[in-house]
From Swiss-Prot:
GO cellular component, one term: cytoplasm
Residue numbers binding Mg(2+): 54, 93, 123
Protein name per UniProt: 3-methyl-2-oxobutanoate hydroxymethyltransferase
Subunit composition and interactions: Homodecamer; pentamer of dimers.
Gene3D superfamilies for this protein: Phosphoenolpyruvate-binding domains (3.20.20.60)
GO terms for MF: 3-methyl-2-oxobutanoate hydroxymethyltransferase activity; magnesium ion binding
Family statement: Belongs to the PanB family.
UniProt keyword terms in alphabetical order: Cytoplasm, Magnesium, Metal-binding, Pantothenate biosynthesis, Transferase
EC number, UniProt record: 2.1.2.11
Localization per record: Cytoplasm
Species whose genome carries this gene: Janthinobacterium sp. (strain Marseille) (Minibacterium massiliensis)
Domain of life: Bacteria
Length: 272
């Protein structure tokens, strides 16, 4: 076990500390959680960031997409997670339909911040720049989600790898820079070629978190039910079962943190 995991974290994770991690080349770990007990365990295991994802619609509520999730759903689970986490950085998804206008986005983001979120995550490209600016100017930190954005599943025609053409890759790069200029603090990259994940991470100052975006992102994220192998159905390529060789979920969580920190996850078989 690495010395990182042997030492309990005493200081709260912050946006400046996450940026400092990118600058010194230390990988950031993020996992999803939906209740206080899992949040507390992840915090104890050294996970830097906990995401209350709209993935709760699929893994908790049993829907076949994230689209039915409401702002009230996310706020409820955010409050649960915030009570359990002591030092990890807590971030919440803005669910489908909750940020159609910048004013509506602010109103709903406030609900999540009041529930305990320290940052909100929104999906979308250049057209979200005004919303990002509107939120950050009003003291709400924002992570922007590019690549495979699940709320756009019907437009994509399914869950497909994005950014595979030179044109699509260049568009994503320009959008990342535009959103950073608008005030975005972090960038989540999902299901894109590993080479593009590397280029985007080098291009922007803000930390990047990857899920199926290669090993060169500033950090990685997985969904709770995926890394402990309890979500039924076909597993995405970027998922690894960290329960293998472990006797507890805590052990699996520590194994995930160690694998991200030492660069062994994601491996080539988890990348596009």
């Amino acid at each position: 076990m690495s010395s990182y995991l042997q030492e309990a974290r005493t200081k709260a994770v912050t946006i400046p500390s996450l940026l400092a991690m990118k600058e010194r080349g230390e990988k950031i770990t993020m996992l999803t959680a939906y209740d206080a007990s899992f949040a507390s365990m992840m915090d104890t295991c050294g996970v830097e960031m906990i995401l209350i994802g709209d993935s709760l619609g699929m893994v908790c509520q049993g829907h076949n997409s994230t689209l039915p999730v409401t702002i009230e759903d996310v706020a409820y689970h955010t409050a649960c997670v915030a009570r359990g986490s002591k030092t990890a950085f807590v971030m919440s998804d803005m669910p489908f339909g909750s940020y159609a206008t910048k004013e509506e986005a602010f109103k709903n983001a406030v609900k999540l911040v009041q529930a305990g979120a320290q940052m909100v995550k929104i999906e979308g490209g250049a057209w979200m720049a005004d919303t990002v600016r509107f939120l950050t100017e009003r003291a709400i930190p924002v992570m922007v989600h590019l690549g495979l954005t699940p709320q756009f599943v019907h437009q994509f025609g399914g869950y497909k790898v994005q950014g595979k053409t030179a044109e699509a890759a260049e568009k994503m790069k320009s959008e990342a820079l535009l959103l950073q200029e608008a005030g975005a603090d972090m960038l989540l990259l999902e299901a894109i070629p590993a080479s593009l994940g590397k280029e985007l991470t080098e291009l922007v100052k803000m930390p990047t978190i990857g899920i199926g975006a290669g090993p060169d992102c500033s950090g990685q994220v997985l969904v709770l039910h995926d890394y402990i192998n309890v979500f039924p159905g076909k597993k995405a390529r970027f998922v690894r079962n960290f329960m293998e060789g472990q006797t507890s979920i805590e052990g699996a969580t520590r194994a995930y943190v160690a694998a991200v920190k030492d660069g062994s996850f994601p491996a080539p078989e988890h990348c596009f």
